[in-house]
């Protein structure tokens, strides 16, 4: 195969696809570029399915090479190691729109690798990475119902921006990524600043319209390359087995899905499944294997639940389609934390804890596009331990899902946080999912808002989140508010919306089918807003403004000193500032502009540090009396240390009212005496003792 290239314009950027020059032994390989950013995408698939395979083993890994930006990796080994959070999030972003486009029944292993090999400091590689994956899969021959397109949308001054640069995003009220086919939107990921439902929906439609040029050109690129499709056919449906399961076990499955408690329901469904396997598996006579019976049992299970929803029957837990599960909201549940909340929605529960730290405890972030490390003063960590779903599992390693859900929660909260200037703390929020039956990330957003207010963080407005679902068959569809885990698994859409009473902060949408219309999205957004306002109303009954009387809240302040006093505060070899920290047990930092940050968990410690900093950095006041120590005696007087690093001269004539012939007759080094400041002359301090003595 020779070298093939295809270039096209998308917005203000030129995108180029190339294949046949690099990575020629991969089943599909595309070098995609936009401006100076270049990404190599490779796809390799297995021609055979592993025996007994019952899921689609697709792996997607996005990798940023530091050489792409002219950097050498930090650390001892000086090579790229474990994936960064950005790499993990982008891997998930790419996986989500392509996974639904592999045909049902295709379970051959597929590996997609995306490697950033040249990086422009203004272009996020994620959009062209998705376009490159779309092209590489389409020319690989692997069964894939693409191509897809993708676009980023910004919004500022009432206008949308297509594929904005990093600089343009700084002033944007929206950062949205949308991906889909020529006819369907498959994935949306967005962060916003309290925008209306209409602005968000119009942005999704705008992106879908704009990436059509990419889909058209990728299709032309595929034709240009010439692709030989794999000889693969979807396995035929065993209609007899499917019919037998429906007739023998359909009613039992239907009754089992009326059990409201998740664990009890799963136990009952498991018992019915075991009975079906015992009744229908007979590999010697009819060839029905355990795996085959399990597969068709799952199909009947899915169709049973979906049909009930479409018929507007009561949902699994007895609710109608627009009702939010019962809420239980508590704050201040942990005695010694800075802020805490326990948010329970049905069988989903999040224990969310806020910790306030000093600015020096910020997370240092190294970005490919930036030459300098950046401080992140807001940390949000989401933990999903196995016990929350009644399972045994490995602990210790942060999973991709936890990173992805944590980022979604962060997006929901970030727009309402005060700036570091308004609130000079590093803020860490941890969400521990203690129970899960759907929508744990949205419970985390509600819990985070409550926990932050309990800690006294002056957030701009309370934030709540809700997960919506969809079941669609032909022209029939039903939108569900506050979906359960089973409704998420058996449905066609996962649509998460978070925001305040004023607007949307975050939206995440994953759609498993084609044919989602603007009407469906409008209804989903309308129901989500109603549910969000309902939840916010109940949250506000518990806590509606920051708790300013929290005894556990650390104390912090920033004081400004003259830049020529920085040296005095630090002292020789850091001696002075280290002494303040050691004596007060507080954290003290000073920057080059003279901003001194003092932080302590204890009021007494904070006050001590504050006074010591002021003693070192403030100029003595004329007429004020100080208690000082004699540090040196000379013929013409004595030098008295009245403040840290500040000595004044007590002239021999100012020691006593009577004539002093010899200083040593009145003072000796180490004596503590009271003195009054007479004058300040170009940094020289003149003192008097005799004015404080009676004649």
UniProtKB/Swiss-Prot annotation:
The keyword Acyltransferase does not apply. It catalyses: RNA(n+1) + phosphate = RNA(n) + a ribonucleoside 5'-diphosphate. Residues 623-690 form the S1 motif domain. GO terms for molecular function: 3'-5'-RNA exonuclease activity; magnesium ion binding; polyribonucleotide nucleotidyltransferase activity; RNA binding. Its cofactor is Mg(2+). Coiled coil: none annotated. Signal peptide: none annotated. Component of the RNA degradosome, which is a multiprotein complex involved in RNA processing and mRNA degradation. Belongs to the polyribonucleotide nucleotidyltransferase family. This is Polyribonucleotide nucleotidyltransferase. The gene is pnp.
């Amino acid at each position: 195969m020779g070298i093939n290239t295809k270039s096209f314009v998308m917005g203000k950027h030129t995108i180029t696809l190339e294949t046949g020059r690099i990575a020629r032994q991969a089943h599909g390989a595309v070098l995609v570029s936009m401006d100076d950013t270049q990404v190599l995408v490779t796809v390799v698939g297995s021609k055979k399915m592993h025996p007994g395979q019952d899921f689609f083993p697709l792996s997607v890994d996005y990798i940023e090479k530091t050489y792409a930006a002219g950097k050498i990796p930090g650390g001892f080994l000086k090579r790229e190691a474990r994936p960064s959070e950005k790499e993990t999030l982008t891997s998930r972003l790419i996986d989500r729109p392509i996974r639904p486009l592999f045909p049902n029944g295709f379970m051959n292993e597929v590996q997609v690798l995306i490697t950033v090999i040249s990086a422009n400091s203004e272009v996020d590689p994620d959009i062209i990475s998705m376009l490159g994956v779309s092209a590489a899969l389409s020319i690989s021959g692997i069964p894939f119902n693409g191509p897809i397109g993708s676009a980023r949308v910004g919004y500022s001054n009432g206008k949308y921006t297509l594929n904005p640069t990093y600089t343009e995003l700084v002033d944007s009220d929206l950062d949205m990524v949308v991906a889909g086919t020529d006819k369907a939107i498959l994935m949306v990921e967005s962060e916003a600043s309290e925008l209306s439902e209409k602005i968000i929906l119009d942005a999704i439609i705008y992106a879908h319209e704009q990436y059509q040029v990419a889909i058209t050109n990728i299709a032309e690129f595929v034709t240009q390359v010439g692709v030989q499709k794999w000889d693969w056919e979807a396995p035929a449906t065993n209609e007899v087995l499917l019919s037998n399961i429906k007739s023998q076990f359909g009613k039992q499955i239907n009754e089992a899905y009326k059990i409201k408690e998740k664990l009890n329901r799963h136990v009952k469904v498991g018992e019915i499944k075991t009975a079906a396997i015992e009744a229908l598996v007979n590999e010697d006579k009819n060839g029905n294997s355990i795996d085959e019976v399990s597969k068709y049992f799952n199909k009947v299970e899915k169709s049973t639940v979906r049909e009930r929803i479409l018929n507007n029957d009561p949902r699994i837990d007895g609710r109608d389609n627009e009702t939010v599960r019962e809420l239980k909201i508590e704050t201040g549940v942990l005695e010694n934390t800075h802020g805490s909340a326990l948010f329970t929605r049905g069988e989903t529960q999040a224990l969310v804890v806020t910790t306030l730290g000093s600015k020096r405890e910020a997370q240092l972030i190294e970005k490919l596009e930036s030459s300098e490390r950046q401080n992140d003063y807001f940390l949000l960590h989401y933990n999903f331990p196995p016990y929350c779903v009644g399972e045994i599992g490995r602990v210790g390693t942060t999973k991709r899902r936890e990173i992805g859900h944590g980022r979604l929660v962060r997006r929901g909260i970030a727009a309402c946080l005060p700036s570091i200037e308004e609130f000079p703390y590093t803020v860490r929020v941890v969400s521990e999912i203690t129970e899960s039956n759907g929508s744990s990330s949205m419970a985390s957003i509600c819990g985070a808002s409550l926990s932050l207010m309990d800690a006294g963080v002056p957030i701009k407005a309370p934030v709540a989140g809700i997960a919506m679902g969809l079941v669609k068959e032909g022209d029939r569809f039903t939108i569900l508010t506050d979906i359960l885990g089973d409704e998420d698994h058996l449905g066609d859409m996962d649509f998460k919306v978070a925001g305040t009473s004023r607007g949307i902060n975050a939206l995440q949408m994953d759609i498993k089918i084609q044919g989602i219309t603007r009407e469906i999205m409008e209804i989903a957004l309308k129901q989500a807003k109603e549910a969000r306002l309902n939840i916010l109303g109940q949250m506000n009954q518990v806590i509606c403004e920051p708790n300013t009387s929290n005894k556990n809240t650390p104390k912090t302040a920033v004081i400004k000193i003259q830049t020529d006093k920085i040296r005095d505060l630090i002292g020789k070899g850091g001696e002075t500032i280290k002494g303040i920290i050691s004596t007060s047990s507080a954290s003290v930092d000073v920057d080059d502009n003279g901003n001194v940050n003092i932080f302590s968990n204890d009021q007494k410690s904070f006050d001590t540090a504050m006074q010591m900093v002021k003693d070192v950095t403030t100029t003595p006041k004329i007429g004020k009396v100080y208690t000082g120590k004699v540090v040196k005696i000379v013929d013409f007087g004595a030098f008295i240390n009245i403040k840290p690093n500040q000595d004044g001269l007590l002239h021999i004539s100012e020691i006593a009212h009577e004539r002093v012939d010899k200083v040593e007759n009145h003072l000796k080094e180490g004596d503590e005496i009271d003195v009054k400041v007479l004058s300040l002359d170009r940094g020289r301090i003149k003192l008097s003792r005799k004015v404080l003595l009676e004649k």
